[in-house]
Amino acid sequence: MSTLDKKEARRLLRAEKQAEKHSLARNLISRRTNFFFNILLIIFCILIVFPLWIIVISSITSETALTTYGYRLWPMEFSVNAYTYLFRDGSIMITAYKNTIIATLTGTVLSVVTVGLYSYALSRPDFRFRKFFTFFSFFTMLFGGGMVSYYNMTRSVLGLKDTVWALFLPMSFSAYWVIIMRTFYQSSVPEAIIESARIDGSGEWRTLLQIVCPLAIHGFATVGLFSAIGIWNDFRNCLLINDSAKFFNLQYTIYQTMNNLRFLKENASRMGGVNVANLPAETFRMAMAVVTVGPIIMAYPFFQKYFVKGLTVGAVKG
């Protein structure tokens, strides 16, 4: 290589380094901007945590102190009367928790399996009836049968009355979850991998279980979290389908307890032995929120990274 060529090569190398430095400088933000964004995130976190803190503190405050002093950052008068009233009959709450946990776990697994299989079929370009089943699924996002037909279908046709199945089976499938999983299959699983597996003699089930599922684990976690939150917070199915207290879930049990408490407060004048001041009303609502949201908050950190990625992929490419 001549001296002229060496100089030209060094000049081009320096130009590339300078261009790289300028590119990095454009992508980096200043300390002042970084500090500003950190302050915004801290304020946002406070806005999220503050209501939860108020709920917890209010639930362990006496009804009289809460009525007199209002909401405080620390209980003015410590009391667990709201939780005592909520768990006054332990067997009812234990049954409600048991039914809710069983329904949530079983329904989540069922949702992941059904949505995963259905979405995988829709993601395959060689599936003959892909358009029909895509329309069949997404049609339910636009039109619903109504409450009367829903009531008759679940109670009479499917025979779900007074069963644990009523708490999760009607919620085990969603067209929105199908969109998320289909997007994951199409974006996270290259077609070349599936073709290579077929060339090596792998069948559809082996390809799905050993190759596709590990690559789409974020999608399964997202669908599972959506399903678990929906089943845990649902009380409409229990209200419409179940009549026996043995099959009530946590949300409907607390809903009934709140109605009973409201009835006592409104009709206290007719009941000489009832002291309205000792009945928790606002504190009971706060205790209900703590009892119902607590397990979900504790479980969410384990699924957070999957959940965030699932929403991102589903939103961008769905």
Which residues are covered by each model-predicted region?
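A hydrophobic, multi-pass inner-membrane permease signature
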Residues: S2-G318
